Amino acid sequence: MKKLLMLTTGGTIASVEGENGLAPGVKADELLSYVSKLDNDYTMETQSLMNIDSTNMQPEYWVEIAEAVKENYDAYDGFVITHGTDTMAYTSAALSYMLQHAKKPIVITGSQIPITFQKTDAKKNITDAIRFACEGVGGVYVVFDGRVIQGTRAIKLRTKSYDAFESINYPYIAFINEDGIEYNKQVTEPENDTFTVDTSLCTDVCLLKLHPGLKPEMFDALKSMYKGIVIESYGSGGVPFEGRDILSKVNELIESGIVVVITTQCLEEGEDMSIYEVGRRVNQDLIIRSRNMNTEAIVPKLMWALGQSSDLPVVKRIMETPIADDVVL
């Protein structure tokens, strides 16, 4: 019999109507009471970690979630984490870096409609998450609307539809329906890799989206505030060097010891800075390339990498090395 633990953090799935709109209010045991027992041979216990709207999610809370999994890892066969949808992709990626080579399923889910509403996707999503947790497939995953997504590859694309999340630049792991679980990709974990937990994070990371007209001077203000900056550039990853010269400011950031990651605003296919002059002018030895990683994975990965070291070559190596299938080289 599988022994599962549900860790709750709040989110839409646990929300109720209040004077100022929807806000988390359903407790862990109550949340589970809305879901009918499955035929799967399992028992489930609950633990409430927090009860927040995921818009208020912070890196320190990622650590709390990871530590809860660590503390209970030996006592349970799998974990279901309920979470708000707005920052779920960031959390799933962060857990993928802090909880590497898990031999047990760590499944994150939530809903677009509160579980207390008559018409809701919450019951199905929790049910699907439990079913997948019973499979015993190790790793961190997002389960939503019948789709199983690698924890580092989930992105929220829709604000209202049930199919809020998609897997970007990576196949779906599986699909869940009434007939069972249909695997779309074989999940393999090297047997010699042991489960490791490292919750060291440096939260001094900024995400900046380029746009025409952006003032280069704003980069000066970032020097004293951050140790790492993720720049969402255009297309294949070029950086403007004419008119409002952003490239010079990027070079100044690097010279001052700040780690800079270049990614693209395009969701699919990733950056390739080797194609255009605007990409080739960037110093490939000093800049960190994101290739086809999702922004929602790049940000927590950079926090985690800077938590391991402040040395640029070390951080660059970590960032450009695949972890939990976050990048395909």
Curated annotation (Swiss-Prot):
GO terms for cellular component: cytoplasm. Gene3D superfamilies: 3.40.50.40, L-asparaginase, N-terminal domain. GO terms for molecular function: asparaginase activity. Coiled coil: none annotated. Residues 2-322 form the Asparaginase/glutaminase domain. Substrate binds at S54, T85, D86. Signal peptide: none annotated. PROSITE patterns: ASN_GLN_ASE_1 (PS00144), ASN_GLN_ASE_2 (PS00917), ASN_GLN_ASE_3 (PS51732). GO terms for biological process: amino acid metabolic process. It holds the Pfam family Asparaginase. Its EC number is 3.5.1.1. The active site is at T12 (o-isoaspartyl threonine intermediate). The keyword Secreted does not apply. The keyword Hydrolase applies. Transmembrane segments: none annotated. Keywords: Cytoplasm, Hydrolase. It catalyses: L-asparagine + H2O = L-aspartate + NH4(+). Induction: Expression is induced by asparagine. Homotetramer. B.subtilis contains two L-asparaginase isoenzymes: L-asparaginase I, a low-affinity enzyme located in the cytoplasm, and L-asparaginase II, a high-affinity secreted enzyme. This is L-asparaginase 1.
